[in-house]
UniProtKB/Swiss-Prot annotation:
Record has Signal as a keyword: yes
Protein name: Beta-glucosidase 45
Catalytic activity, EC: 3.2.1.21
Native source species: Arabidopsis thaliana
Domain of life: Eukaryota
Role played: Hydrolyzes p-nitrophenyl beta-D-glucoside and natural glucosides such as syringin, coniferin and p-coumaryl alcohol glucoside. May be involved in lignification by hydrolyzing monolignol glucosides.
Lineage, opening ranks: Eukaryota, Viridiplantae, Streptophyta, Embryophyta, Tracheophyta
GO function terms (MF aspect): beta-glucosidase activity; coniferin beta-glucosidase activity
Keyword list, A-Z: Disulfide bond, Glycoprotein, Glycosidase, Hydrolase, Signal
Gene: BGLU45
Length: 520
């Protein structure tokens, strides 16, 4: 019996080795391709942003930004009535955080520049060289540990003075301000930064800042929100127009002045969600397409094709600004080298244009008459979570990447944010937060979906987990935790969650598989 068992084991091992190495021996590219589609230059990283991480409020010449003012004036709008004056103090603890990155084995780190550290008053004041010095030291420290900086020029925070002087993104002057910021950053950091993005999630920033008014500058009108100023059916599109042209200005500066010598690439980051028609009716299918047009395509179509989506033009008419012939030419010659995709969740979509529809998120004109729902009847769109906007639906992520692949052929993509949020309830213990099995389940499912999309032909070049650390999560304050590392809000001590070890092992496993392929 023992000999028979040994014989069976030998046969099984031979079969496995033949399966792995025996097929297509003449082409190493095919070996283990079913196991790991990640190429050798694929970026595995974590993501952050200046306001959510740095802290160091007004330190070393930093000025007030829009979120400083918003959180100080309106603490009641933040779930825990907090702000990011201290945040997780990465400004002073970045060397410790780079050690955590090294533990994970990531080869890239996505962070953003604090506009207020570099240009406290925009073009109305001087460059703050203490801010330049900080980012130079930070970038050098990352590179010394083999971690590539992946830098966002602006992640929603900007000098409050620009809001006070000319209403920031509602004014074309903001294009000049942003171009000036970009030029300074390329000049001082571009010899080491090879991956740039201009704006983070302009579509989400526009919706929350100018449509519903939940984010600064808190502008909106009924029925979209309750604000003291603003017009939800015109201002989001005016601000978007200026953001898109500001992006093009920054890209043009990089491509004409710096790219040839610095040999980097530049793109933009948008928020995406998968929108699944709630039924097989043509009306709901068309509504799902409108939902995409009024969300991610709103930004991506202009920066890639130089025009707004047809669905937006048809519904909004003259409320949607038009690009001049010169602006179209500038957009065409300032085409992004890649796009960054932030993705967390999915929704069912119900038509509200030709059908009777309840009021709710997405149901009105400026949203495309496409109602967003988390369930149809008793069936939910994936697994619902304690975070009201996040639903676990890896299949939707797979569909989203294929949709982008088909709409923007051959455009390289980076998954610049993807992660799972734990809502900290009064009864939640630190032990429960550290034992984050639900986050592991989420990441495993979404990374599997990513691999499937890459096998389908999606040109994805990197994946960044949101986030390295628990941090200030906007209106949720510190009550929603996205980090691979737990942060004690009193001591700021960083402690690895189970997901940190899981991600470390995942990276090691796929890098090792890659090495087998490359060396075979």
């Amino acid at each position: 019996m023992k000999n028979l068992t040994s014989f069976v084991i030998v046969i099984l091992l031979q079969s496995l080795l033949f399966h792995v190495y025996g097929r297509h021996q003449s082409s190493s590219k095919n070996i283990l391709v079913d196991s790991s589609p990640f190429p050798s230059d694929f970026l595995f990283g974590t993501a952050s942003s200046a306001y959510q991480y740095e802290g160091a409020f007004l330190t070393d010449g930093k000025s007030l930004n829009n979120w400083d003012v918003f959180t100080h004036k309106n603490p009641g709008k933040i779930l825990d009535k907090n702000n990011a004056d201290r945040a997780v103090d990465q400004y002073n603890r970045f060397l410790e955080d780079i050690q955590l990155m090294s533990f994970l084995g990531v080869n890239s780190y996505r962070f953003s520049i604090s506009w207020c550290r570099i240009l406290p008053r925009g073009r109305f004041g001087e460059i703050n060289y203490l801010g330049i010095k900080y980012y130079n030291i930070f970038i050098d420290a990352l590179i010394s540990r083999g971690i590539k900086p992946f830098v966002t020029l602006n992640h929603v925070d900007y000098p409050q003075e620009l809001e006070d002087r000319f209403q920031s993104w509602l004014n074309p002057e903001m294009q000049k301000e942003f171009g000036y910021l970009a030029d300074i950053c390329f000049k001082h950091f571009g010899n080491r930064v090879k991956y740039w993005t201009t704006l983070n999630e302009p579509n989400q920033q526009l919706i929350l800042g100018y449509l519903t008014g939940k984010f600064p500058p808190s502008r909106c009108s009924s029925p979209y929100g309750n604000c003291s100023q603003g017009n939800s059916e015109t201002e989001p599109f005016i601000a978007a127009h200026n953001m898109i042209l500001a992006h093009a200005k920054a890209v043009n500066i990089y491509k004409t002045k710096y790219q040839k010598e610095q040999k980097g690439s530049i793109g933009i980051v948008v928020q995406t969600s998968w929108f699944e028609p709630i039924s097989d009716s043509n009306a709901d299918k068309e509504a799902a397409e409108r939902a995409q047009s009024f969300y991610s395509n709103w930004i991506l179509d202009p920066v890639i094709y130089g025009k707004y989506p047809k669905e937006m033009v048809d519904i909004l008419g003259p409320a949607l600004p038009q690009f001049s012939s010169n602006e179209v030419k500038n957009l065409e010659k300032s085409r992004a080298d890649f796009v960054g995709i932030n993705h967390y969740t999915s929704y069912f979509i119900q038509d509200c244009l030709t059908s009777a529809c309840n009021t709710g998120h997405g149901a009105f004109k400026a949203e495309g008459y496409a109602l967003k729902l988390d369930r149809k009847g008793n069936v939910t769109i994936g697994e619902l979570t304690d975070v009201n906007w996040q639903h676990i639906d890896p299949t939707g992520f797979h569909k989203m990447l294929n949709y982008l692949k088909d709409r923007y052929p051959n455009m390289p993509m980076f998954i610049t944010e993807n992660g799972f949020g734990d809502l900290q309830k009064p009864e939640t213990t630190d032990k429960e937060l550290l034992n984050d099995t639900k986050r592991i389940q989420y990441m495993s499912g979404y990374l599997e979906a990513l691999q499937a999309a890459m096998r389908d032909g999606a040109n994805v070049k990197g994946y960044f987990v949101w986030s390295l650390l628990d941090n200030f999560e906007w209106l949720f304050g510190y009550k929603v935790r996205f980090g691979l590392f737990h942060v004690d809000l009193t001591t700021l001590k960083r402690s690895p969650k189970q997901s940190a070890s899981w991600y470390k092992n995942y990276i090691e496993e796929h890098v090792n598989r890659r090495d087998i392929v490359d060396n075979y």
